[in-house]
UniProtKB/Swiss-Prot annotation:
The gene is pdxT. GO terms for molecular function: glutaminase activity; pyridoxal 5'-phosphate synthase (glutamine hydrolysing) activity. Its EC number is 4.3.3.6, 3.5.1.2. Belongs to the glutaminase PdxT/SNO family. This is Pyridoxal 5'-phosphate synthase subunit PdxT. Pfam families: SNO. Pathway: Cofactor biosynthesis; pyridoxal 5'-phosphate biosynthesis. It catalyses: aldehydo-D-ribose 5-phosphate + D-glyceraldehyde 3-phosphate + L-glutamine = pyridoxal 5'-phosphate + L-glutamate + phosphate + 3 H2O + H(+); L-glutamine + H2O = L-glutamate + NH4(+).
């Protein structure tokens, strides 16, 4: 089985490394691949959309033909993890900033996002988070992070910070405003792997 990490921009190598370590710890076997072009996603049993700059990410996903492949994979129930800008890309609706830049969001999650909910790049910070799927706090690394301001009834809220939703799940899709790949804590990647292998 392949797990594809969208490798257009963002913390790509960190996600690949975290997934490989999580696979090893779980005693699972899968090939983690960097996805740069159309044609790889249909072979993947799991997809990661890393952080980066959401406007550029949306444009490149559409241009490379990867956006439609991700939508098709999601419709088939393939587990998808989006972190930071990945959370924005997965959403159905953005704020005025997103509308202004004409970003073509994937619309896979029934969520509305505030693109820079936690400020600009200089406003990076860490916070101890209670995340519903974990049995103890998780250190969230936030870098110019977005936040979910509202969501539909099918969305399960997993964590909040400052009245904003920062982790949510809708069926096969998991979206985080923070960067689990920038910590040594593999629990979220392991949770995602469990979703992938249950779906396989």
């Amino acid at each position: 089985m392949k797990i594809g990490v969208i490798a257009i921009q963002g913390a790509v190598s960190e996600h690949i490394d975290a997934l490989r370590r999580a696979l090893k710890e779980r005693g699972m076997s899968a090939e983690v691949v960097a996805v740069k072009h159309k044609g790889v996603i249909p072979e993947c049993g799991g997809i990661v959309i890393p952080g980066g700059e959401s406007t550029t990410l949306c444009r490149l996903l559409a241009r490379e033909g990867i956006a439609e492949e991700i939508k098709d994979a999601s419709a088939r129930g393939v587990p998808i993890l989006g972190t930071c800008a990945g959370l924005i890309v997965l959403s159905k609706e953005g704020d005025e900033q997103v509308e202004k830049t004409s970003q073509e969001l994937l619309g896979i999650m029934d969520t509305k996002v505030n693109r820079n909910a936690f400020g600009r790049q200089r406003d990076s910070f860490e916070a101890e988070l209670e995340v519903e799927i974990l049995d103890s706090p998780f250190t969230g690394v936030f870098i110019r992070a977005p936040g979910i301001v509202s969501c539909g009834p099918e969305v399960r809220v997993l964590s909040r910070l400052d009245d904003l939703i920062i982790a949510a799940e809708q069926g096969n899709v998991l979206a985080l405003a923070f960067h689990p790949e920038l910590t040594e804590d593999l629990r979220i990647h392991q949770y995602f792997l469990d979703k992938i292998f249950k779906n396989a």
